[in-house]
Amino acid sequence: MKNRNTIFTFFISFILCLGINISHAQTPFDAIMMNQRESCLAVIYEHSWFDEYWEGTYLRTNGTIETVKRDMVMPMIAIGVFDQLNLLVAAPYVKTESTEPNGGYFAGAKGFQDLSLALKGQIINKQLNSGTLSLLATVGFSTPMTNYLSDYRPYSIGFGANEFSFRGIAQYKMEKGFYVRGALAYLHRGQTEAERDYYYNNGSYYTAWMDVPSAWNYNAVAGVWLLNNSLKLEANYLGIKSTSGDDIRPYNAAQPTNKVSFDQVGISAQYYLNKPQGIGALSYFSHTINGRNTGKASMFGVGLTYQFKI
């Protein structure tokens, strides 16, 4: 087996899934807040694939399993607890598989991944020169919903450990609809249990428990609202950098202890219908341009959103 970037399964999807707030989208990474008692349900479909991966920093071609593919369906809801405090909940279902050249075959995996909860609060929202400056903070927690095997790389549907996230967000939006946004997050991860009692991580460990490396998450966006705030277009960058971990050893499978880093660039579009009111649609595409111990993956996604009052 070759490495599969399961670590970003939640990140990429949660970045781009959204709710609607008076024709505006909301994610854990943006600067938009829903009003109190407003809710929005979103359903996202995402497909990703790769046939190359980084073994450490060396780029290899998948030989035995060729192209690794992942499909995900994720329901999500965003709730306006207060005007300045929102709750977001997501529960993705993931299926992985690969093509099988040379007569080889490896079974994929499927199931619900992690239950993810996030609270987003608005700290500052004020006029500054000809635009608006917004500062926000997000705290999140995710935990496995099922007893999936995290050490089955590249097919594992997740890294199998609890995660706490702490994120700061800053956005400056101009009057004509252009905006720039940046976000920085620290992702603190726990341990996952493997179905073996020995592994190597820069040394021998005689235990089934593996430390999943914590990581820093970077996000930068440039976007614009068009058509009377009914169409939003964005170009974005996403980066992940683990704070510890080991490299994949030559011709060995990846494991949850690996030090994963990657840089992705992408585009997205979101459109909100005037009638029926509260309905929106989204699409996005992203590509991994650099990485370490991860697949050189591309992905696209589509989704629908519906806003309603509680």
Annotate each predicted stretch with a short phrase.
Residues 47-72, 154-156:
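Surface-exposed strand-loop-strand hairpins of Gram-negative outer-membrane beta-barrel proteins
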Residues 45-51, 91-97, 123, 141-147, ...:
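Transmembrane beta-strands of outer-membrane beta-barrel pores
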Residues 37-39, 45-49, 157-249:
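Detector for outer-membrane/organellar transmembrane beta-barrel domains
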Residues 54-56, 63, 205-310:
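Outer membrane beta-barrel transmembrane domains
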Residues 69-73, 110-117, 133, 160-164, ...:
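Residues that define the transmembrane beta-barrel architecture of outer-membrane proteins
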Residues 29-37, 84, 125-134, 176-177, ...:
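Short loop/turn motifs that connect adjacent beta-strands in outer-membrane beta-barrel proteins
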Residues 99-207, 254-258:
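Outer-membrane pore/translocation modules
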Residues 43-45, 75-79, 89, 117-121, ...:
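Residues on the lipid-exposed face of transmembrane beta-strands in outer-membrane beta-barrel proteins
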